[in-house]
Amino acid sequence: MHCHNDDVRFSSSSIRIHSPSPKEQHSLLTNLQSCSKTFVSHLSNTRNSLNQMLQSLKNRHTPPPRSVRRPNLPTQMLNSVTQLMIGKSSPISLSLIQSTQFNWSESRDENVETIRGLSSPLLCCASLSLTRPNESTQSVEGKDTVQQQKGHSVSRNAEERVLISEVLVRTKDGEELERKDLEMEALAALKACRANSALTIREVQEDVHRIIESGYFCSCTPVAVDTRDGIRLMFQVEPNQEFRGLVCENANVLPSKFIHEAFRDGFGKVINIKRLEEAITSINGWYMERGLFGIVSDIDTLSGGIVRLQVAEAEVNNISIRFLDRKTGEPTKGKTSPETILRQLTTKKGQVYSMLQGKRDVDTVLAMGIMEDVSIIPQPAGDSGKVDLIMNCVERPSGGFSAGGGISSGITSGPLSGLIGSFAYSHRNLFGRNQKLNVSLERGQIDSIFRINYTDPWIEGDDKRTSRSIMVQNSRTPGNLVHGNQPDNSSLTIGRVTAGVEYSRPFRPKWNGTAGLIFQHAGARDEQGNPIIKDFYSSPLTASGKPHDETMLAKLESIYTGSGDQGSTMFAFNMEQGLPVLPEWLCFNRVTGRARKGIHIGPARFLFSLSGGHVVGKFSPHEAFVIGGTNSVRGYEEGAVGSGRSYVVGSGELSFPVRGPVEGVIFTDYGTDMGSGSTVPGDPAGARLKPGSGYGYGLGVRVDSPLGPLRLEYAFNDQHAGRFHFGVGLRN
């Protein structure tokens, strides 16, 4: 910057966020949570890199006359110029230069004495050059460089005060600003610089930054002019352009509507850096809220008031699967086909990577049941600005034998249901394709179930995530739920041989549908295992009058689940149609529905559930709807309220935390067969004098466990009889 002999000038550089180099894009990917540098923070960082700003302005003085020889000098000198260079890595160079008409051929001492003996006002200044620490300092000056005052320190000159008589804001050409509102903005930003105030260089420098930080100006140069009334301080500013348009580059997923909303308030107004910063922050926040790898990387103002916004979005370049050893954590060969895992992911190549989407993908892979641990590691894909994803998977043991126990509803004479034992073999990952095979045997005092189940969670080649399940089962369950309480204390069991296939798939978020075809061969047997067709009351045990009923069922089911916890909303609808493929096969239609709704009231939770069903056609008596018991109307034994062709059961529960995993609960239940008990073949409920409707109420405790909630409850029915109930899991 060229110097003038009649002013003191500060110049500041305009600030621009530079476009990232490939190396900086690499840094962008490694620091996912970093935000773009704003104009204000960039200016602040630049200010921190300044060591000092130096200028020598000394008050006029009139020393007593001395008899010394002096050269022909002007009566007034104000020839100091200060220049400030701001750069990313360049040193800061400050110099103070004085142009004089001294006869420098005289000796050094004589010149010093001459300066001290001036009777006219004189501003003395030194020539200094400052660089960053640890950098070499070089000073190359011409013949006019003054070197006498090397002892002046930076801090001392910065703290010297100069009386300012007037403070003005002007254009860079010294003219008045056309827009007075901008002039007022600049004046309002000043803190120290006021008329008739003594200022230091540091205070002037700080006010320069305040004007820049107001956001309306791209440059500000303080100029000191000596007038007859004193020193006038002018801030020569260059306002920003008016905002006339916006160009956004590389924003593939950022909605254009969101960009327009972020910048809408600034159209037609002078560009304000602070408002641009707010817009950039909102855009970066949009990416962060969605977990997207995106950031505003550059912003620039073009001619005509066009703002150019550049966005860096990290697209997925490649996705790979890496299996890790369960014990050592080292890479190993996995048993699962990588394609089986990759097709579970919603993240695809070419998409902008989302951490939230990646978390959902991790949860999906864990839900397959074959992985012990899953994590996603994003890595830069070279200098392409894209990202490679590595999914680390630790596999669980694929299969084995297990044994356990459970609760059966077969024994109803005591407060607790009978215990059953189980033995099973399962394979979670057949052929490395996440296919499941389960062979189990459950045995109780009366109950017994042998089941073979094969499930393919996702049929290969299907893009709708359709699953297939094939089941073969042989079961024996107590018949006393419908045909119990026989006077001779005899008991009977219902034997069923079932085989079927079902297909399930999600068809909407939180909605799942199932369709299947099931064949059933069922009949009743006495305690010795002999087939029987009538009970003690001569009520038929089969619909066909034969020892066994055979049915081909076509099944349709739709289930809605909310968040999945026990207090969330749930709705299920099921319809089964008996197909008379052969004349003796049963033909009927059965419809059932269940709904549950939870409401949180402070720490407590209110849960309301409702279930019901109806059967039309010819069906087996033991297939009637059973009312009463732990999962129906508490306070009654299993099936003690009634059994009918139709039913409705409602329940209300208020649960509240007690301590840790323990909850207390207060409940009431009501159930009715809607007068349909007599329409069941043989009217087994009427023969046993079941009321057909009833209610119960009580209280209990629940404990969370790996098996699900353990429920211990005590309830009274409408006959004032009390009964304990114990159950595992949520009520049906």
UniProtKB/Swiss-Prot annotation:
Residues 11-20 have a biased composition (Low complexity). One of its GO terms (cellular component) is chloroplast outer membrane. It is found in: Plastid, Chloroplast outer membrane. Disruption phenotype: Embryo lethality at the globular stage. Residues 314-396 form the POTRA domain. Keywords: Chloroplast, Membrane, Plastid, Plastid outer membrane. Signal peptide: none annotated. GO terms for biological process: chloroplast organization. Residues 1-23, 135-154 are annotated as: Disordered. Its main location: plastid. InterPro entries: Bac_surfAg_D15, D15-like, POTRA. Belongs to the OEP80 (TC 1.B.33.2) family. Plays an essential role during early stages of plastid development. Probably not processed upon targeting to chloroplasts. The targeting is independent of the general import pathway. The N-terminal domain (1-52) is not required for import, membrane integration or activity. This is Outer envelope protein 80, chloroplastic.
